[in-house]
C-alpha cells in the first residue's frame, strides 16, 4: 500500500517523529513523507509513534488508494491539528475568534480543581504529630491510635473554628505565621471515652474540604467490631441524613483507637506537634494564600463546593487522590520546602531514608491536584478513539440481521439529543439475532464521528467476556490496542487462546461466526485517533499498571464487570480512580445484567447511577430483563444524570433522558424525565414484543412436570430417589429426541441441570452406579465450576465441539461420538451433561432434551434456551415433551422450610405455601418455556404466591423497597436508598449490600511433576520450592455400572502433557499455571477426576 504521512509536530516532538519517520519513508517535504509499505510495517510505525508521542505530537497517515483518492487511516497525537479528513488549516490565529472558551460546558471544573488543591494543602497536616514522626524514624509504632487523616481533619476543624465559609477562606487568603498558635489552642482531641463529629460545627464549604481530607485514603464507613467496639451501635438508615453531623466518629475511619495496647503517653503524642504543623512553613502559607484568593474570586465557588454537588466533590476527591499517589511516588522538590520546618511526610520504600518534607508534600499534592483537576474536562479529547469505521456502517445482507440496520439508523438520528440529554437504551432482541454486534453498532451510532467512538461492554462471566471480545474483534478487525479484553485471569485467557488456535488448525476454512453472511471487509476499515495524554501525571500513573492503562485507553473495552465496579464499590486505596475515568470518557453497555444474583443488584444499580453522574450513555442488553430491574436502573440513571447536568451542559436544561428500545421486530425512542411514564412505554413495548414472538417463534421447547418423591428426608434417600426418578426418564427422552446414524445407531445429547454442586455430585454418583438398559450406553459428563482450571477448560472445549449443532452432519465427526459409534457394540448412545448453571449463561450449546431441578423461574427459562438452540426449523418442532421439570427440588425433598433458594428468591420473609411445581406454576407458564413470565410483571401479588409472582415481588422489594415498611426493619436496605438518600460520602451501603460477597477461599493447584506421578494438591509456600503438598481434598473411588462411561475422559496426565508441548513448558509450570482451583479452607473436600472437587455429601 502507498501512504502519505503528514507531521504537524512542534518542538521536541518534531525531532522525535522525524527520526522515526525517516526510517520508514522518504521525505517529500519539510513535514511530509511518502512510501510503499506493508500492513505489518505500517502497524509497527504507528506503534513506535504512539510510544514516543508527547503533548506536541500530531501525525496523520493517508492511504493513497488511486490517482484522485486518498483516505485518512489514523492520527497519532493532537487531533486539533487536522480536520475530519486529515487536512491541515491554511491559516491559524491566536485570537479567540470563535469564542470557544465562552461555551465551555463545564460549570464546576475550576471549582473541583480548587477544592482538591485546598484539601491537598491540609490532607496530611496531621502527620506532624509526634507519634507519626516517631514511626517514620523507626523509634515508634508504625500505626497510631488515630490515623493521620483523622488528626488532619481535627486540625482543619480547629482552623475554621466558628467562622462561616467566606470568613475562613478570607483568613486562609491572608494567613500569617500566627495562625498556627490559634489553631493548636483550639484543637479538639478525641478520647477513647468520647468523640463527636467534627462536621457538626462546620459550614458547607468547610464540610466538603473536611470530607476530602478524611476520605483521601478511604471513604468513611462504620467499622463494626464486636471485639474492639462491642458497645457501639450501627447507624440507623432512617437517620442517614444526619450521619455526617451526628454519628460520624473515629470509628468510621479506623478501629485503632479501640485497641487496648496503647499507652497514655502514645495517646498524648498522637495530638502533640513539637515542631508545629505545615502552617508554620512560609512556602505552605504562600500557596494557601494563592489558592484561597483564587477561590474567593470565583463567583460559582460557593455554589458548587457543597457536598450535595456529587459530581463536583467526587471529581475533586479523584484529583486529590491521584495527585497524592503521583507526588508520593516521585522525588522531593526542594523549591517547595521551608528549610526551617524539619517535619517529614514519608520515607523511601527501598532505602527507608526520609524522602519528602511535610510542607513540601502538602504543597506538591495541592498543586498537582489543581492541575489534574483542570485536565479532567479535556481527558476525553486526549484518549484514543476510533471513527469512520466501515464495519459499523455496513448494511446487513442476511435477513435475520436486518433489524441491526434499523437500530443503527435510530441511534444515528438521536446522536445530538443523546449528547445533550443522556441515553438509556434497552436491547431485548432474542438470542441468535446478533445482539452483541447490534449493541456495538448502537453505541457507535450515538457517538460523534468527529471525536470518535469509545464504549465499554461489561459482562458477568469470564467466558462470556472472552466470547464477546472474539466476536467483535473478528467482525470488526480491530487491533488489540483498539479492542481490549479484561477478565482478571491470564491463565483463563491463555487457555481460551490455545483452544481458539486448536480449532482454527482443525478447520479447513476460517471460522466466520453467526453474523458472517456479510463479506469480509478490507483490513483498513476505520480511522483511529491515538491521542496523547496531555497530563504527564496521569500518564505516569497509568504506566505503572498495564491493566489500568488498557482499562482507560482502549476505545472499545470488553471486560468482566469487576473492573468497573470499583467506581462505586472501592472504599480505599484509590481503586475507584480508573473505572471512574473510564465512565467519564466512554459509554457503557451492560450485557445480561439480569444474570447477576439478587444480592449483587444493588451494587449494579450504584454503577448505573455513577455512569449517569459521569455523563455516560447506557445500554442494557438482555432478552429476559424483569420490569423491576429496568425501573430501578432507569431511576438510578435519572438521578445520576441530574448530578451530571448540575455541573455540565446548558444551565437549567430540564431532565429529559433520551430512551431507546430495540429488538428484532421494532426500534423506538422517546424522551422521559419521569420513571412512571417511562415504564408505561416500556410495558407497551414488551407486550408488543410478545405478540410478535407468538406469531414468529416456533414452539421448540415443550415442557412437562414429572413427579419425584422420597421415602424419607434423609440425604442419601433423597439423592437415590432423585437419581431413580431421572434415570428412566433420560431413556424416555432419548427414544423421542435422538439422531440416527446411517449405520442405524442412535445418539442424543441431553442436559440434567441441578442447582448446586454437592447435590449434583451426590446424584451423579448414584446414576453412575445404575446399569443401563440392554443395548444402551450412557456417557456422563459432570460439569460444574469446581474442576481445576485446565480440566474445566477442556470439558468446555469438548462440549463446544459436540453442542454446536448448526450443521446436522457435524455431530458424527465429533471425536467422542464417532468413537462411541465405531468402537461400541451398543445401538443406543445417550450423552448426558450433569451440570449446574455453568451450562447456561455464556454457553452457546444446543441439546436435544433436558431434565431440570427447579429453584426459580429463571432456572427453568435458562436451560430451556439451550434446547434446539441452533436448529430453528419446523422439522425440529417436538410432538412430545423435550424438557422434564422435576416437581420438587432436593431442598424440598429434604423437608426444608425454604426450598427455592441459593439460587432462588424464596426466603423466611418471602416464603411459598407449597414446593410442588404443579401448584406453583400454571400450565401456560411452563408448557412452552420462554422469557414471557420474566419480562411481564403479574397483575397481582396476592398470596399464595406463584413461582413467577415470588420472583417479581422479591426483585421489587430488593431494588425499590416496600412502601409501608420501615427501613430499619429490613435486613438489607433497598437499592433505591442509594439515589434517594444520597449517602455517597460514605461506604455504608457498600458495606451492607456488597458486590459478590463470598466466603474467604485459598488457591490450590492440582500438581503433576512427572508422567508417572499421581496428581496431588499443592499450595504455595515460603519454602525453597515455593510449594508444599496439601490434603485439602481427599481422593474418592467411583463405581461405574455396566453400560456407563465417561463422555469426556478426565485424563489429567494427557491434558497436562498436551499443554506442556504446546507451551514448551515443564509439567510443573503447567501445573502451577493451569491447575488452579479456589477452595474454602474450613470445609471438607473430596476429589475424583470425573466428579471434580466437591463437599461432604451426607
From Swiss-Prot:
Mg(2+) binds at residues 124, 216. The keyword Transmembrane helix does not apply. GO terms for molecular function: ATP binding; helicase activity; metal ion binding; nuclease activity. InterPro entries: Cas3-like_dom (IPR054712), Cas3_I-F_Cas2 (IPR048823), CRISPR-assoc_Cas3_HD (IPR006483), CRISPR-assoc_Cas3_HD_sf (IPR038257), CRISPR-assoc_Cas3_yers (IPR013395), P-loop_NTPase (IPR027417). Its EC number is 3.1.-.-, 3.6.4.-. Induction: Expressed in late exponential phase (other phases not tested); part of a large cas-CRISPR3 polycistronic operon. Keywords: Antiviral defense, ATP-binding, Helicase, Hydrolase, Magnesium, Metal-binding, Nuclease, Nucleotide-binding. The keyword Transcription does not apply. One of its GO terms (biological process) is defense response to virus. In the N-terminal section; belongs to the CRISPR-associated nuclease Cas3-HD family. In the central section; belongs to the CRISPR-associated helicase Cas3 family. Interacts with Cas1 in the absence of crRNA. Probably interacts with the Csy ribonucleoprotein complex composed of cys1, cys2, csy3, cas6f and crRNA. This is CRISPR-associated nuclease/helicase Cas3 subtype I-F/YPEST.
